[in-house]
Regions:
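FAD-binding subdomain of flavoenzyme oxidoreductases
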Residues: 108-264, 463
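Activity-critical C-terminal alpha-helical subdomain
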Residues: 187, 435-469
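C-terminal substrate-recognition/cap domain of FAD-linked oxidoreductases
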Residues: 34-42, 223, 238, 244-412, ...
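Alpha-helix capping/hinge segments and adjacent helical runs
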Residues: 29, 419-430, 459-463
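N-terminal flexible segment immediately upstream of the FAD-binding catalytic core
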Residues: 1-70, 87-117, 146, 270-282, ...
Length: 469
């Protein structure tokens, strides 16, 4: 034991000493880190605080994950899994007596099969690295998020991430053929299926997809890729009414014959925010329209998209449009949609991720804004989202972040959502932040079944305790 490790060991809570000693004895040197080397780490890339846990385990193999969890299970020790820490719902927050299990060293892309269009990837690999590796073999991994350069595959799968192309390719779970996960007692479930069709018994991967590390820790996955797309015409479109927006979406769906891969909508105030100083972005269209839609059509010809836009202009569904003429222009258009960080100039900002039926969307946004105006002076609500799949994001600033202000903002967002049977979490998960509102979406029988499953798979409740319900 080094001097620094010995010093950190002295600072450990007495109750943790036996489990830490067991972990350090069983795992390779450098796998377990203690004290300041842990607490100096950020609790999340969107947060200003640090990890509260004093102990962090960094396994390099599934066997090491299994060993660590077996020891923690024997000692009734709580474990919080960490990936890229890009989550927005406090799903990876720790308490002082927790142990963090980081997937940062599970970072190998093990195999790519161009003929079978599959990849075998460890949980700590960044999403962007997965995308780039697929492209190097003439493939595409369709999952895409603004945090692609920071988020990890394990986190994407454990939260069932959505992103920009759900309208065509589905959620993260739709891109997984098989996976490997370690249960609370160290049991390894190696369900590394490589077939698209496999109805032999329960599809066990779904116990770990979207369950936020509460039932097991994902270590590896078999991903389903697609053939690389050589064309992806992209346009930014200005629209003045939500009814016209819905009609335009239908026209695109019909005209592109299944090639519509993104339909991202920015409300006027968000578009103005990201195209005016201090934002560095250029303004491709005037900012006086009600909505701005980023359209992407993977696999379509540019002429096909341009013809649909001309028809929409003639039908007065849209008022203006610009079609990208280069990859640089495409990146600039996507840069507008991804520049959510501009909202932080009004910090503190409350971020929301909701889903609802398209037919309710315009009225719902009006109801949220009315609720905010009734509760606060001069609130700001920047609205954008994956409208093509019914997902909205809000960035709301009310001049503070006291408990009363947070509760007021949440009431303005969630109460009208409950009335129309929407979801408080479209793609970010539940974590701690949305836990009080789970009953808005799930009835008591559903929540009780979740508890029953949790008790069966993690009887000592050590995995990511307190999250979801």
């Amino acid at each position: 034991m080094t001097t620094s490790t010995a010093s950190a060991d002295k600072a450990l809570n007495q109750a943790q000493r036996p489990v830490v000693q067991a972990l350090m004895a069983a795992l390779p040197k450098g796998t377990v880190i203690l004290g300041g080397a842990v607490t100096e780490r950020s609790a999340g890339i969107w947060r200003s605080d640090q990890i509260q846990a004093q102990v962090l385990v960094r396994p390099k193999t599934t066997e090491e994950v299994s060993c660590a969890l077996r020891i923690c299970h024997e000692h009734h020790q709580s474990v919080v899994p960490h990936g890229g820490l890009t989550g927005l719902v406090e799903g990876a927050l720790t308490q002082p007596l927790d142990i963090v299990l980081s997937t940062e060293r599970l970072n190998v892309i093990e195999e790519i099969s161009a003929s079978e269009r599959t990849m075998v990837v460890q949980a700590g690999v960044m999403l962007q690295s997965v995308q780039e590796a697929a492209a190097s073999e003439g493939l595409m991994f369709p999952l895409d998020l603004g945090s692609r350069g920071s988020c990890t595959l394990g986190g994407n799968l454990s939260t069932n991430a959505g992103g920009n192309r759900v309208i065509r390719y589905g959620m993260a779970r739709d891109m997984v053929l098989g996976l490997e996960a370690v249960m609370a007692d160290g049991t390894v479930i190696s369900s590394m299926n490589r077939m698209i069709k496999n109805n032999a018994g329960y599809d066990l991967k779904h116990w770990f997809l979207g369950t936020e590390g509460t039932l097991g820790i994902i270590t590896r996955a078999v991903l389903r890729c697609r053939e690389e797309v050589t064309t992806a015409p992209t346009a930014l479109v200005a629209i003045n009414s939500f009814d016209a927006l819905v009609a335009f979406l239908k026209q695109l769906d019909r005209g592109l014959a299944g090639n519509l891969s993104a339909f991202e909508v920015m409300w006027q105030n968000f578009y103005q925010l990201v195209t005016q100083p201090p934002a560095p972005n250029q303004r491709p269209l005037q900012d006086d329209a009600a909505y701005y839609v980023l359209v992407e059509a993977m696999g379509a010809a540019q002429e096909q998209l341009e013809a649909i836009l001309e028809q929409a202009l003639e039908a007065e569904l849209i008022v203006d449009a610009v079609v990208s003429q280069s990859s640089q222009q495409t990146d600039q258009l996507w840069g507008l949609r991804d520049d959510v960080a501009q909202t932080f100039q009004f910090s503190p900002v409350f971020l929301f991720d909701v889903s609802l039926r398209l037919s309710e969307m315009a009225r719902y946004v009006d109801a949220v804004n009315a609720g905010l105006a009734a509760r606060f002076d001069a609130p700001k609500n920047f609205v954008l989202g994956h409208v093509g799949d019914g997902n909205l994001h809000f960035a709301i600033a009310v001049g503070g972040d006291s408990r009363a202000q947070r509760e007021g903002v949440e009431a303005a967002v969630y109460e009208p959502l409950k009335a129309i049977q929407g979801s408080v979490s479209a793609e970010h998960g539940v974590g701690l932040e949305k836990k009080p509102y789970l009953h808005f979406v799930r009835d008591e029988a559903e929540i009780q079944l979740m508890r029953t499953i949790k008790a069966a798979m993690d009887p000592r409740g050590i995995l990511n305790p307190g999250k979801i319900f």
